[in-house]
């Protein structure tokens, strides 16, 4: 296990040397969760406090730490942490032991590039280098039995051939959506688009076309989940596959490839039908997987699937129950049950009642501790996903000018107002204000939890310990930083462009 026991430096935050000494004793030397909680309370890191500046991670700092993990890139926060890596390759973490995450996962890379492409000023060179690196990955994956479902590659771009959970068919879908958004930003007639990204002739090996063809012909295949643990059918995988096919159909039409557009639309409709089967009406939440036993099905991957699988250009899609967007009643109902499942599970949560935010992990039954198996922990990406769903739902309500409460989502909304009832509340009404304000406060609570568990320099590992709050697992996880920036955009009423 790799565990970095680094906390904030209380003496910087406090004027009292005596109190600073007390905090050092509590934070640095105690493994007692209650003591750690008291320490956080004393230095103002309770979950309902305001934004934690300047010690805690900020969006710009997270973005720069994320960039530092890309081959050939240079950031203002640590330069480049992955020297010698293939240009444009996104490395999951600089950690090479305990655990070794020094690889380029297609999924992590695509999610990272979604954040890069969504910036106000586009770093075209960085994204082109990424696209070129992924083209090499595609070519190398062609020799694998998993094809474009090959999950990860060595730092030099060569195929990772060791034992692993294969295939992971969410990966090409995420990559396709990211690069379609990039193509739209630089212009569909740009030579890089027409030469590298999309050619209607599949034999030409263009990056987007290769992925869309793979997704459209293999979405029904059994696949490993995004956690790389279980094989079957997964909500997250299907959600992002459908998004890629919807994006791909529109893009193919624009690229004068009507036959492909028709086929992608047909397959997207079939995926949408399959997604409906994940709703568990008996338990009142979206199941994360099918064909997997021993789990409740409440899983962070559903939150991520809602965020990465909806059409961000269409606010109506965000509330449509059949679309499973982040503002839909079924996703919000699942959000409540997912968050509640961790309230008493982790000691650092102190069994806080709703509507308080708490640290969340992947799923209740998790035993991966960041390097081996013992007990699962809160993850930064999951706690941030819980925040981003709320921030996105509020943004959608503001954009639409109303908020709809159904019998399905009523328990979710009653966290914020005991008088909430099924119906539609117009923007400006007292109930609209009460509900959206409560959601924003809860979202800020999740972010404050994340910020209170970052290290003193603002860096984030993959996990933080369920009892002590210390960071552990892979250090400087690229996805953790991408998740922080993604949620920050949502909190400003912006969405990722992909």
Language-model segments: residues:
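Extended ligand-binding clefts on enzyme/binding-domain cores
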Residues: 106, 139-170, 235-242, 254, ...
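Glycine-rich, acidic and aromatic/proline-enriched surface loops and short helix-turn segments
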Residues: 68-82, 136-140, 178-185, 210-221, ...
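CBM-like carbohydrate-recognition segments
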Residues: 143-144, 149-154, 369-382, 408-498
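Low-complexity, Ser/Thr/Pro/Gly-enriched N-terminal "stalk/linker" regions
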Residues: 36-104, 128-129, 133, 137-150, ...
